[in-house]
């Protein structure tokens, strides 16, 4: 058969040969159709090569879609840039139509059925800029101060409610800050143990690499003698006729006892 398989192109010829040799009593129903509309003769689709245009200009951005921006985008960037920890608070991001903020009355920052968050500050700022004709900075300060006041009030309510519940016997587990501090303490203690091991290994390696005489005497060597040992040394030297640590290296005659150590 070689490199190419031509049997699909010869299906009609094969069917006619089988009919002529009377191996098939009838021609297939598609025989006339394939004869009127024969299959393509090319085995591979040719590669479409576009001519290379020299000195072509840069493609125009006329048909490039413009970025979709909203007026609230810059306000959100300013608020969450100043309050990055607000992004760590859990919040509901599911919306029905994308215009849920338009269903609230933003003449006040607190809305029934909506959690007080950064989006409340953004929408309140937009309302002040539109209806009170305030500047961007003034509206931002006003909305931010209202947000701080209500957030502080909510935290006081939650703290008092917790204290009242604990007073009547309720028990609350550890908070996220306490759990985080415990994990940090464990990591710190593990790091200290690892650091001590590394320091000991480094000191041992340096001691092995040092080939000279160490200035520091080993423990127990070079320390002061006890009183008994000193007396024994004095008596031993007295027998030799000299006593150390005495003025003018006093020479003791034979038969004379050495002075006792004070």
Curated annotation (Swiss-Prot):
Q: Where is this region: Disordered?
A: 211-262
**What does the sequence similarity comment in the record state about its family?**
Belongs to the mitochondrion-specific ribosomal protein mS23 family.
Task: Relate the assembly described in the record.
Answer: Component of the mitochondrial small ribosomal subunit.
- Identify the GO cellular component terms for this protein: mitochondrial small ribosomal subunit
- Native source species: Phaeosphaeria nodorum (strain SN15 / ATCC MYA-4574 / FGSC 10173)
**What is the designated name of this protein?**
Small ribosomal subunit protein mS23
Q: Which InterPro entries match?
A: Ribosomal_mS23_fun (IPR016939)
State the source organism's domain of life.
Answer: Eukaryota
Q: Which UniProt keywords apply?
A: Mitochondrion, Ribonucleoprotein, Ribosomal protein
Q: Which GO terms describe its molecular function?
A: structural constituent of ribosome
| Pfam families documented for this protein | MRP-S25
Q: Where in the cell is it found?
A: Mitochondrion
Provide ranges: composition bias, Polar residues. 242-251
Provide the primary localization: mitochondrion
């Amino acid at each position: 058969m070689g490199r190419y398989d031509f049997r699909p192109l010869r299906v009609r010829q094969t069917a006619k040969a089988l009919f002529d040799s009377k191996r098939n009593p009838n021609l297939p129903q598609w025989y006339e159709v394939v004869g009127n509309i024969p299959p393509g003769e090319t085995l591979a689709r040719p590669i479409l090569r576009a001519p290379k245009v020299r000195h072509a200009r840069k493609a125009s951005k006329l048909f490039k879609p413009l970025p979709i921006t909203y007026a609230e985008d810059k306000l959100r960037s300013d608020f969450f840039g100043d309050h990055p920890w607000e992004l760590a608070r859990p919040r509901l991001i599911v919306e029905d139509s994308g215009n849920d903020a338009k269903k609230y009355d933003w003449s006040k920052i607190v809305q029934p059925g909506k959690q007080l968050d950064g989006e409340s500050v953004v929408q309140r700022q937009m309302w002040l800029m539109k209806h009170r004709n305030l500047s961007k900075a003034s509206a931002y300060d006003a909305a931010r101060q209202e947000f701080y006041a209500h957030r502080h009030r909510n935290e006081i309510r939650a703290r008092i409610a917790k204290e009242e519940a604990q007073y009547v016997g309720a028990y609350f587990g550890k908070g996220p800050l306490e759990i985080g501090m415990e994990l940090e303490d464990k990591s710190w203690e593990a790091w200290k143990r690892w650091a001590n091991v590394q320091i000991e290994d480094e000191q041992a390696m340096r001691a092995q690499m040092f080939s000279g005489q160490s200035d520091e005497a080993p423990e127990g060597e070079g320390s002061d003698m006890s009183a008994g040992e000193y007396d024994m040394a004095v008596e031993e030297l007295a027998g030799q006729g000299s006593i150390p640590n005495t003025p003018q290296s006093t020479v003791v005659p034979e038969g004379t006892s050495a002075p006792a150590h004070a």
